[in-house]
From Swiss-Prot:
Positions with biased composition (Basic and acidic residues): 186-202
Protein's organism: Mus musculus (Mouse)
InterPro entries in alphabetical order: Ribosomal_mL64 (IPR018472), Ribosomal_mL64_sf (IPR043035)
Function: Acts as a negative regulator of G1 to S cell cycle phase progression by inhibiting cyclin-dependent kinases. Inhibitory effects are additive with GADD45 proteins but also occur in the absence of GADD45 proteins. Acts as a repressor of the orphan nuclear receptor NR4A1 by inhibiting AB domain-mediated transcriptional activity. May be involved in the hormone-mediated regulation of NR4A1 transcriptional activity. May play a role in mitochondrial protein synthesis.
One annotated GO biological process: mitochondrial translation
Superkingdom classification of source: Eukaryota
Coiled coil location: 98-207
Identification of the protein by name: Large ribosomal subunit protein mL64
Amino acid sequence: MAALAMRSGYLLRLSVALGPRSRSYRAPPPPRRRPGPHSPDPENLLTPRWQLTPRYVAKQFGRHGAISGVPPASLWPTPEQLRELEAEEQEWYPSLATMQESLRLQQQALEARRQAREQRIAECMAKMPQMIENWRKQKRERWEKIQADKERRARLQAEAQERLGYHVDPRSARFQELLQDLDKQQRKRLKEERQRQKKEARIAAMASAEAQDSAVSGEPSS
């Protein structure tokens, strides 16, 4: 225990003794830049890229003047750069006449879209009564078709019950099979009836056309 206390005291005295020496250390100042212009070496790989740009050269001339060694004629933009600057200026800072023309074209486009929208609305409103009438007609036809299917189904069920007897359950497989057969037979008869009517209509149309041709050919020529 006494040895540990003696060792701690030794370390404390050593730190006190080394303290002033560590505080007396002063790092050397960084090297100062020369007041004259700086000419970067393009052959040196350690030269930063931004020091080789025309912008840096222009800054050197603006800071140090003629002693920078930069010829003033090299600071003027080339004809291609001038054209690019003019195009950029026209894009970002257009003239008053250009802005007025652009505003006029925008207003003209807005007016054209407004007129087209109003015309489309007027056309839709003009078609609205006929559209409502067509919708009501389709709704009525669908309702009539549903009612006709219900009546046809009821007649088929009545016919099936007459054939099998009223004691047969309509939900039985035998009753449903007979109902399907009767439905197929009826659909077949309706299809044949429609085909017959179409055939008769074609024959009547052909006869009417032949009669008209005969009447035209039988007229005396003047």
